[in-house]
Every structure is written in structure tokens, then in C-alpha cells.
């Protein structure tokens, strides 16, 4: 597939490396320019391009950008064909993104992103730490393979996203409509807890919007309690412990 990744940070860089390594034709763009794309992001064959070129003639576009800024790309996406699959990886943290009243009033995070962008999106890759994504992807069929939820309103676009999740080394789970994607947002039981395909459905079902938002908003204090240099394993355990 011809894929563009917009955003060359930890998540975007991981996806560019893994998807190009899996044989896809991958381009990477960053709002700061091509020079902002680190050489290691391109080490498996991805190419750095200008942002204006990132959405041209693509089968899929992955948004690996901060939550709440998708509206800045609305003009860029205005001419993108409807059949191009657009995937959103972002997460809403008020202490990082600023308080967004629409979300606080109940608009689901990726529904908000879709509205800003002016087109449908599929939610994927948001519910795993960047380090989990970088180091723990394994071939299909491997016992204990970590699962990633995928939510969206089109069965076909979800199938595309789920195939790409599999290509990055994780089992994909159909988590329902985009309106249900709040269940995989911070800090629900399914968020960054490294669950298998058998474990993930129950975690999504156990999500509680009020409780999970309260846990999310306490994250600065929770991280501080982990000390100066927490490991990814420490973070996963912290997330799991929040729901025991």
C-alpha cells in the first residue's frame, strides 16, 4: 500500500519504520519540515516528504500528531479522495493539550478529530505505549501477542487499519464504531495495559467515562510517584493498577 505518516515523533516514527519494513511504500511528513524527520525513521525504506505532498496519491494516511491540531490540516485534506483511509493515533490529555471544552462536554475524542479534519477517521495505535509499539511487535500467531483496538464507522476502512496493525506486529481487535472509541482512550482499562486479544474485549467493556477521565487527569501525580526514570514496564503496571 501507499501510506503516508504525518508526524515523525515516537509513534509516527515507529509506524513508518514498521510499515516500510513490512513492504509498504511509506512517506513521512512533519509540520517542521523534512529535516525534522530523524534518519532512523527512514532506515527501513520510508522517505521524508514535504507536508503538502504527504496526502497525494495515497491509499492510507496515518495522523501521528498531537490531539486537537487536526483542524490545521483540514485544507490539506479537502482534496483527498474519500476512499483514502485516514487513521488517528492521538490521545487527549488536558495537562498536555489544554482543556478542550467540546471533549469535556462529551464529544468523543476521535469524533472531535474527525470533525476538525472534515472527514471520517479510524482510531488505531493510540492504546499502546510508543515503546511497546517499538519493541513488542511479534509475528501473527505468537503466544501472548499484544492486541490493539481499532474503531471506526466503515467496515472496509477498519479492515484496512486492522491489516496494518497486524503488519506492525500486533493483533487487531474491532472495537466498534468511532463513537465507542472513548473506551480505548486514556485512562481506560484497555489503554496502554498490553493485553492480548482474549483479554482486550473485557477491558473495553469495563471502561467508565467518568472514572477513566479522573484517572487520566491524575496522571501527572501518578507519573511523579514512579520516580525519575520509570521503565515502560513501570508505566504499564501503573495503568493496570489503576483499575484493580
Predicted regions mapped to residue ranges:
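General beta-strand structural signal in soluble alpha/beta enzymes
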Residues: 48, 120-125, 173-175
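Rossmann-like NAD(P)-binding element
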Residues: 45-85, 91-96
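Rossmann-like adenosine-cofactor binding region
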Residues: 68-79, 92-99, 104-106, 223-227, ...
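Active-site-lining helix/loop region of Rossmann-like oxidoreductase modules
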Residues: 143-244
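Rossmann-fold NAD(P)-binding glycine/threonine-rich loop
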Residues: 82, 90-131, 135-139
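NAD(P)+-binding Rossmann beta1-loop-alpha1 motif at the extreme N-terminus of oxidoreductases
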Residues: 1-44
Amino acid at each position: 500500500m501507499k501510506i503516508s505518516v504525518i508526524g515523525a515523533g515516537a509513534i509516527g516514527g515507529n509506524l513508518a519504520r514498521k510499515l516500510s519494513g513490512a513492504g509498504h511504500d511509506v512517506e513521512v511528513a512533519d509540520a517542521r519540515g523534512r529535516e525534522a524527520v530523524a534518519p532512523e525513521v527512514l532506515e527501513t525504506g520510508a522517505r521524508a516528504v514535504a507536508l503538502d505532498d504527504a496526502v497525494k496519491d495515497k491509499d492510507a494516511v496515518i495522523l501521528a500528531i498531537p490531539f486537537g491540531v487536526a483542524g490545521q490540516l483540514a485544507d490539506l485534506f479537502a482534496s483527498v479522495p474519500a476512499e483514502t483511509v485516514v487513521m488517528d493515533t492521538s490521545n487527549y490529555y488536558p495537562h498536555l493539550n489544554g482543556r478542550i471544552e467540546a471533549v469535556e462536554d462529551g464529544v468523543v475524542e476521535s469524533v472531535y478529530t474527525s470533525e476538525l479534519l472534515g472527514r471520517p477517521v479510524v482510531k488505531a495505535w493510540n492504546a499502546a505505549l510508543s515503546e511497546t509499539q517499538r519493541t513488542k511487535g511479534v509475528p501473527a500467531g505468537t503466544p501472548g501477542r499484544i492486541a490493539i483496538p481499532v474503531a471506526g464507522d466503515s467496515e472496509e476502512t477498519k479492515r484496512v487499519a486492522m491489516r496494518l496493525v497486524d503488519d506492525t506486529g500486533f493483533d487487531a481487535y474491532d472495537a466498534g464504531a468511532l463513537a465507542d472509541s472513548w473506551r480505548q482512550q486514556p485512562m481506560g482499562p484497555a489503554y496502554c495495559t498490553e493485553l492480548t486479544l482474549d483479554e482486550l474485549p473485557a477491558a473495553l467493556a469495563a471502561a467508565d467515562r467518568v472514572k477513566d477521565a479522573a484517572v487520566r487527569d491524575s496522571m501527572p501525580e501518578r507519573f511523579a510517584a514512579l520516580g525519575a526514570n520509570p521503565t515502560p514496564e513501570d508505566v504499564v503496571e501503573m495503568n493496570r493498577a489503576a483499575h484493580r
